[in-house]
């Protein structure tokens, strides 16, 4: 059990402890006034109307809990009070408010004279009912039923007497019959409640220290008032609007029912509150009999991510905060809500299961279980959710045709997650509670719920929820405040942000997000168009180098056309092209009809196709014949790609304008000799193209650092490389010895049990993988001071990784197009905090 040590108060010091007025001048310490007391003091300092109030500081509250005597504060004489808890941090909680306090036998005549007999008696009954229930532990209704609007004075006197008797029966003590006695009982109850065992445990769970203190506010209740809540901006959009309600007869009534004068008085509060707090506010208020508003609390206005952005931009435009402060107020990841459809927060969700949110946004569509079915649905104009055990490169065309992707297996950097983020598709992965039955064309969810192909579901890639049926959506919002904020971010950031873009379509999306270039173009994704995949498969299944080279000549114009488009779209910006990386078996068909089609095209038997595919099979393909190993053992593949790149550069440069300087990246390198072998052939191809075309062009050759050995030997690699770009997906995988596709099965348990602070595929591991990055950066630049450093894994869109890369001296990060705004904002925040000398976390 958590123990809470309460400070001992010496008897001689108790008398010196006094309640403090919120209207006192000077600095207000939240440690003394509590969070709520400090807020009230600030309202008073702004010259706003706040009911008179005193704060009992924590040391005095502790003394009262120990039995210290108190008197009714002279400053609050003749008033009815409300007692409210004011811990130093609002989230720590505290005892419930107690009100009304102070209507007793010794004050009743005063209140009858000032408020009328019925109102005074009603207050006295409420006091006995509420305070009596709190002190005795009984329910309010067991002390007395609530007073009714038609009760006469005689009715109320009878109910008061009955309530006194009920209280005495519960406690064996008489109810306090003086205002001071009521105040003492209320304060003591709240103080002792704060130090109870259950309260200590709850506070500790919320991060409160053992010696956390409680202040208590005694505030005058505005007589004959209606209370309410109000904020000055719409919670969803952030646009200026009076939003709230007023309580009357125990019911919430819209502000529109108030008089025009009352609404104007409330509206007039907006300017001083916003100016005084440099933020949009929400308040609790009391309207007195004349319609004058009195403020009883203030908090930051409730707001969605979209509203947060608009509010920050509006405050900066009004010069209430700086542009830099506006940038710092936005959580970078929250920008995803601007970029994608989101489920309306008021929508009721029939959640089937919750898995890993791999790509933000939400989508509704019919279940399809294959890429072909997704393409067929698109052709018919139907929205489809592609559901697979896991995706592979041959599913990419189906993903393009879908509005969302759901996989049973996989993690944050699985194939489905990476491609979906690049396409801006909502994606949920690792839905292990679902049982996919391809024969039955359905999947079974928890509690035996069965969903068949063609049924409608919704996936929320922001929360990871899979939902039955349709959901109302909120559309993306990339205009106005979003554009303004991004322009401010670009003016202050000092690290480049590029995009991972594999096709011209991806490049156009990236360009729309104002990227600084393409940091990773995965050329293998260009081969999965229907008219190309068969040619690619012919090349893979060729028996010898000559046959392979012949087929590659048919692929050359296809690659060249894509590179021409990429260079044209990104004209004036760098484009980093990764040579073929995945193992060849990923391009081969698995479905019987596709195998038969390939056999017909190649004019061979289907058994021959199966046999050749079997020859290419590997026990651990991700660590086998892939990347640079393909380029060295089958050099004609990289030769074709290099030629296509250089011919495309010549074609674009012939049009005039900024010259294209291709950046060619070699994947999965572990030794500098690998780089030297590829470089020799690439340089030879460049010379040949220059001779053939009579054109000169510049290009850069670099390495994708994905293996721990490459990071450790960066000093060697820098001798032959113009740049090093760190592929942190595979680097994390190899550093940890984790499969990114299978880690989702246990990652949640590992994070919950504290093995990992975060999923290392989601947030960059700064201690392990980060140390490799820093080491490689330092060693590489020791050899080559002009070495360009980049990060092109999915971590490029992780705000913590962006800040880390800036500190480590990297030149750029690269991420999926729809994560570019997140990286741009994170980069700006890193620059601002560094300039201000703040510690980056």
Predicted ranges, named:
Residues 2-346, 376-378, 382-385, 392-397, ...:
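Nucleotide/phosphate-binding sheet-loop regions of phosphoryl- and nucleotidyl-transfer enzymes
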Residues 26-30, 359-401, 769-785:
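C-terminal accessory/binding modules appended to enzymatic or scaffolding proteins
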Residues 54, 408-410, 429-432, 521, ...:
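Short beta->alpha connector loops at strand-helix junctions that form conserved
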Residues 57, 391-394, 412-414, 433-445, ...:
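Short acidic loop-to-helix transition motifs that present clustered carboxylates
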Residues 203-210, 327-376, 383-384, 453, ...:
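Long, charged amphipathic helices and adjacent flexible linkers at domain junctions
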Residues 288, 426-428:
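Hydrophobic alpha-helical bundles that form the membrane domains of multi-pass transporters
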Residues 403-409, 427, 790:
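A short, small-residue-rich loop immediately preceding and capping a beta-strand
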Residues 478-481, 488-841:
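Conserved alpha/beta-domain cores
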